Amino acid sequence: MPFFTTARALRCSGGATASPHLHVATVAEATWRRALFYVVVVVVVVAAAEAVPPPSPPQSRTLERSFEMGSKEALPAKDSSIKEAISGKPVLKDAMKFFDADIFNDSKLREMEEGAEEFNVPAFRVNRKLVASVDGGLHNPSVLVFNSSWGGKEAPQDKRFDYPCLCNVKRPSNDEDIAFMTVLELGELIRTKQITSRELTDIFLKRLKRYDPVLEAVITFTEDLAYRQAKVADELLEQGKYLGPLHGIPYGLKDIIAVPHYKTTWGSKTFKDQVLDIEAWVYKRLKSAGAVLVAKLVSGSLAYDDIWFGGRTRNPWNIAEFSTGSSAGPAASTSAGLVPFAIGSETAGSITYPAARCGVTSLRPTFGTVGRSGVMSISESLDKLGPFCRSAVDCAVLIDTIRGKDPDDLSSRHVEFEDPFHVDLEKLTVGYLESAEIEVVDVLSSMGVKLVPFKLNYSVESVQSLLNITMDVDMLAHFDKWQRLGHDDEYEAQDQWPVELRRARLVPAVDYIQAQRTRGKLIREVRESFKVDAFIGNATDWELVCLGNLVGLPVVVVPTGFTTIEDPPKGGTRRRTTVTTGIYAPPDRDHIALALAMAYQSVTDHHLQRPPIDDLGPDDEIPVPPNTKP
């Protein structure tokens, strides 16, 4: 999903106790107070719908027609079924207990019902027609903008990292060794003309087609586009124009990221034939850097977990397991050497979980680092895009390429990163939680980093419930039409989004805003207790996943080893369970987490291990599609 996800942060202008991290575009305070009252009353009335007689068929058809773009039919100003209900016992009397607001007498309840029927329900319908006629949150973003910064400045646009120079990189003799090279190594082969982009594209497309039947990691092959982009990359190099380390390098995108002329399915059977005439900002950045798109990779349905309309994506290290998290395709494909890198997304765990399960290095960056226009939205205050790579060095190269201000994403900004390749480790104080992998602590300590025991202190009792309230309401706003037309009945996993989004209908606006105020309190308390430059902890601890996404903390997921699988087959197997840790930093300090991860990986080789995808054991088989050479 998310693995989980949270909704957009709100703050009323002028509120003395509101968090400084929750900003509102200029709107008069009085307008917001009045709008807030309308929203609260209407949410309550809508939640009481089951107590109201169902609308007649003509009214139902009118409501459905209201979603059609360009419809000129006037919306009904009043709903006779509501008026009919108001004439008897107050409809809200029984419903208010679901909102913990059963505090009004019958007279006040009737007054609320009449006001909602006259003012709020018509306004709701008009607003839905204006902004909710298309699902996915691609258009009409909210003007309420979450800023995760702890006071950092915006960086100059041209301030980029100083990448290490790789000398004496030689082309391996076989394609598999090439497939598991890092981005910088492949870039050096391209730059020195030891290999062409066309050749690399051939290698990775063959691997994708060979191993996808078992991993179920690809939704769409972008073969024609890939060869066109590879041809351009090779021609530019012949002309003496080198675009940088991503020049001619193949990659994959999670299939919630729009690319013109190709399907963007969001992993959902409802949208499996959808083609968007949109070019996502992150795709533009990669195209400008010379990268070659070879595939749209699996997203869990509507960016939730690893189940999608074509199956369920598997873990290359143990095909009896699944990849876990909605960026399943990017994680599995990178792990198996099917692409050198891929771009995924996280709202709550969809980068960290699949990276940890599949044993790849990944970066969930500071919120706002990478523009999200052209990307399906769950929560505008939580959604983030980040890279899956074979090393932290490659993650640094990728984030340097895709970061920056997206003019169509109000939350994106020029984050003031320092160069991770020039961080003085001996000046850092790094905390470690009880859940930290001790090998990482020992290795960094031996390299001059000061390591101290650490714990974050905050008073919020349940960060998970805070995350869920926020996420579910925001997601429902982006998929209101989808739910109203009954498409949730078609959803691939009925215990996931359908249940959560139905429950989201019962979140009052007042309590949603209280949740955002609580989020602001959490941010302040985490900032006050964050007395170190970074800390090391479990990358998949659910409390940390929820907290990190609510606050906007960056984290690098780092492979640290392997354990044996549970109940291995008697004949033996090379399947293993990956072990990882997370290196967390304050917002805008991604370079510190990257520098620490690079330091650890410079003296270890866990991240360079290859999954046993061709030698899984006597009871495992890898299907080879027809007309595809091994």
Locate each region found by the language model.
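An N-terminal boundary/leader segment
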Residues: 2-4, 8-12, 28, 33-39, ...
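Glycine-rich, small-residue loops and helix-cap segments
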Residues: 146, 159-160, 193, 248, ...
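Gly/Ser-rich, acidic/histidine-flanked active-site/gating loops
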Residues: 165-167, 176-179, 184, 212, ...
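N-terminal, positively charged, Ser/Thr/Ala/Gly-biased leader segments
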Residues: 209-270
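Short glycine/serine-rich loop/turn segments
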Residues: 243-385, 433-435, 473, 538-542, ...
